[in-house]
Amino acid sequence: MITTQKKKKNRFLPDFDKQSIYSLRYEEMQDWLVEHGQQKFRAKQIFQWLYEKRVDSIDEMTNLSKDLREVLKDNFTMTTLETVVKQESRDGTIKFLFELQDGYTIETVLMRHEYGNSVCVTTQVGCRIGCTFCASTLGGLKRNLEAGEIVSQVLTVQKVLDATDERVSQIVIMGIGEPFENYDEMMDFLKIVNYDNGLNIGARHITVSTSGIIPRIYDFAEEDIQINFAVSLHAANDEIRSKLMPINRAYSIDKLMEAIQYYQEKTNRRITFEYGLFGGVNDQLTHARELAHLIQNLNCHVNLIPVNHVPERNYVKTPKEDIFKFEKELKRLGINATIRREQGSDIDAACGQLRAKERQVETR
């Protein structure tokens, strides 16, 4: 028996009266329709209204019968995100502060590149991982987002882009929260945005980043979906990584590397390691050599990230010349490495700066 309300998969999910229609995968919509005496092909029509025509209400789905629309309204809600603040950076990056149905707030970022528009989505209200350089974890974890709330972030940004005939071409799951701590909803989200009948964003244009939740890395290796995979590493030894990322005390670097090796053997896909450079902490050439030794046998890429200022944190940015030296040393040792282009730091939209808290800023 298919029910309209999915079983709650963890205690951190909200308990809303109705499920978001955006949380349903295509096959779940088909099953629901059959259960309610409808034909499966209606699922394609509904998904077209949701993701191609991007309507704001079920009543606008005019090729569905009135009775079906009423049943849909009785069972589902169309998740809407209220834009509380919208800020635009000098480089064109746009940060959205969205209010959720229960009053919590999250942040989502639109980044513009030569190759297209990328959206950085949030998967949790807050975060409990506790990285000592990150703003997202300052208030702790409030709750997980439903798949529909993650989908709605992309849809809301896409509706903004519709005004200029642009589209979201890439998604990075690197906003507030640890995606692998909201694994089932994240996977539903990935499938929904990847469907031909959904937002139709290619799997290879989607990247998920984790701080290193080892059991979920093994799970992710078994998924039949070619999503890009990134790991926030930031140090190549347990002493420094545990100071930067307390999660390392539970999942040591040795265990993390075992899981990553398994993922690579299973999927034959390249891994991206994200390495934030913190002045005087992990940015010396000895650290570069240590990193190169750790990952030398992996098919991987290192994304070097200049640390961004967070008022509550005491880390300082590594000087540019030292960042270039670090990159050069990695390349000398045979490691593919690039320096991430900094975007949105003037509106606190860059790596490590997102938080689920409204600020007194001008809406632009």
UniProtKB/Swiss-Prot annotation:
Cell compartment(s), UniProt: Cytoplasm
EC number: 2.1.1.192
Intrachain disulfide bonds: 120-351
Cofactor(s) recorded in Swiss-Prot or TrEMBL: [4Fe-4S] cluster
Coiled-coil regions listed in the entry: none
Cofactor binding note: Binds 1 [4Fe-4S] cluster. The cluster is coordinated with 3 cysteines and an exchangeable S-adenosyl-L-methionine.
Annotated GO CC locations: cytoplasm
Catalysed reactions, semicolon-separated: adenosine(2503) in 23S rRNA + 2 reduced [2Fe-2S]-[ferredoxin] + 2 S-adenosyl-L-methionine = 2-methyladenosine(2503) in 23S rRNA + 5'-deoxyadenosine + L-methionine + 2 oxidized [2Fe-2S]-[ferredoxin] + S-adenosyl-L-homocysteine; adenosine(37) in tRNA + 2 reduced [2Fe-2S]-[ferredoxin] + 2 S-adenosyl-L-methionine = 2-methyladenosine(37) in tRNA + 5'-deoxyadenosine + L-methionine + 2 oxidized [2Fe-2S]-[ferredoxin] + S-adenosyl-L-homocysteine
Annotated residues for binding of S-adenosyl-L-methionine: 177-178, 209, 232-234, 308
Chain positions recorded as [4Fe-4S] cluster binding sites: 127, 131, 134
Domain Radical SAM core stretches: 113-346
Keyword Methyltransferase tagged: yes
CDD domains membership: Radical_SAM
Keywords, comma-separated and alphabetical: 4Fe-4S, Antibiotic resistance, Cytoplasm, Disulfide bond, Iron, Iron-sulfur, Metal-binding, Methyltransferase, rRNA processing, S-adenosyl-L-methionine, Transferase, tRNA processing
Example of a GO biological process term: rRNA base methylation
Note: Reaction proceeds by a ping-pong mechanism involving intermediate methylation of a conserved cysteine residue.
Protein name listed in UniProt: Probable dual-specificity RNA methyltransferase RlmN
Organism per entry: Staphylococcus carnosus (strain TM300)
